[in-house]
Swiss-Prot record:
S-adenosyl-L-methionine binds at G24, G25, H26, D43, F68, D90, Q97. Transmembrane segments: none annotated. It catalyses: cytidine(1402) in 16S rRNA + S-adenosyl-L-methionine = N(4)-methylcytidine(1402) in 16S rRNA + S-adenosyl-L-homocysteine + H(+). It comes from Francisella tularensis subsp. tularensis (strain WY96-3418). SUPFAM superfamilies: Putative methyltransferase TM0872, insert domain (SSF81799), S-adenosyl-L-methionine-dependent methyltransferases (SSF53335). One of its GO terms (cellular component) is cytoplasm. Specifically methylates the N4 position of cytidine in position 1402 (C1402) of 16S rRNA. The keyword Cell membrane does not apply. Belongs to the methyltransferase superfamily. RsmH family. It is found in: Cytoplasm. The gene is rsmH. Its main location: cytoplasm. The keyword S-adenosyl-L-methionine applies. This is Ribosomal RNA small subunit methyltransferase H.
Length: 299
């Protein structure tokens, strides 16, 4: 979303972080606006790291193989706390990850049931299905995927694994889900469970919460944070965190019934409260239809 770059209000001499490099779309747009400034990009995906090293050989650019949850620690180690002019985060799975069946994210193209963004560590989605109990699996589908038939699907999966040993491929899982609940809407019936499993395997929501918890220490006064989310769980976390720092009086009164707080507790202000992709962006990338942009500035 071009709006996300515009709303960062790039300082040509500033220090910026692209928390989710992907294939460098946002990084390239930021670098084009920098003169003596620098950009630090993060990604868990080794394919993204390789792409950055091959195609972004700029003296003012650095790529870090790590989750964005480690941004605070990186800034602490490099004496950058409170010196960052802006951070952009484009959450969720990237198009190259979805389009590569071998990565295991797609429920329409067959591949190994992996789903790890960082294939150098962690358990695969296939292993997770084997190790999780029915109750845990049902919880993941319900909470991370907002799946109405979570328990029914979890029971069917565990029964299938007991009879067949494992679920090894993406289409094997997608077909099992479809056979369990049928096709009741336009969306592929496997959509929610695949999302939930991916979030679990990659600790996506925990990583997001970890970054947002320390983000004020990273950003300088006047610095901006732009977050693009693609589903309600991510967006809810972002909105609630930002809202609590923009209007602490409202949050505290509603939750704790405490007296109104003084204005010194207000840490952020809205630049873009909520924005969706425009028609041109939708024509270029249909996957952006569910994207929500929120941008704040540190006071």
């Amino acid at each position: 979303m071009q709006e996300s770059i515009n709303d960062l209000n790039i300082n040509p001499q500033g220090i910026y972080i692209d928390a989710t490099f992907g294939r460098g779309g946002h990084s390239k747009a930021i670098l084009n606006r920098l003169t003596t400034g620098r950009l630090i990009a993060f990604d868990k995906d080794l394919d993204a790291i390789s792409y950055a090293r091959e195609n972004f050989q700029f003296s003012n650019f650095e790529i870090v193989h790590a989750s964005f949850a480690s941004i605070y620690d990186y800034c602490l180690q490099h004496s950058l706390l409170g010196k960052i002019d802006g951070i952009i985060m484009d959450l969720g799975v990237s198009s190259p990850q979805l389009d590569n069946a071998a990565r295991g994210f797609s429920f329409t193209h067959n591949g190994p049931l992996d789903m790890r963004m960082d294939v150098s560590k962690g358990i695969t989605a296939s292993q997770a299905l084997e190790e999780l109990s029915v109750d845990d699996l049902s919880y993941i589908f319900k909470v991370y995927g907002e799946e109405r038939f979570a328990k029914k699907i979890a029971l069917r999966i565990k029964d299938y694994i007991q009879q067949n040993g494992s679920i090894r491929t993406t289409l094997e899982l997608a077909e099992l889900i479809r056979a369990t609940i049928g096709k009741k809407e336009k969306k592929n019936p496997a959509t929610r469970c695949f999302q939930a499993l991916r979030i679990y395997v990659n600790n996506e929501l925990k990583d997001l919460e970890a970054l947002l918890e320390n983000i004020l220490a990273v950003i300088k006064s006047g610095g901006r944070i732009a977050v693009i989310s693609f589903h309600s769980l991510e967006d809810r976390i972002v909105k609630q965190k930002f809202s609590a720092l923009i209007n602490p009086k409202q949050e505290l009164n509603r939750i704790t019934k405490m007296l109104p707080q003084d204005s010194s507790q207000i840490k952020l202000k809205w630049i873009t409260k909520k924005s969706k992709a425009n028609e041109d962006e939708l024509n270029q990338n249909v996957r952006s239809r569910s994207a929500i942009l929120r941008v704040v500035e540190k006071l």
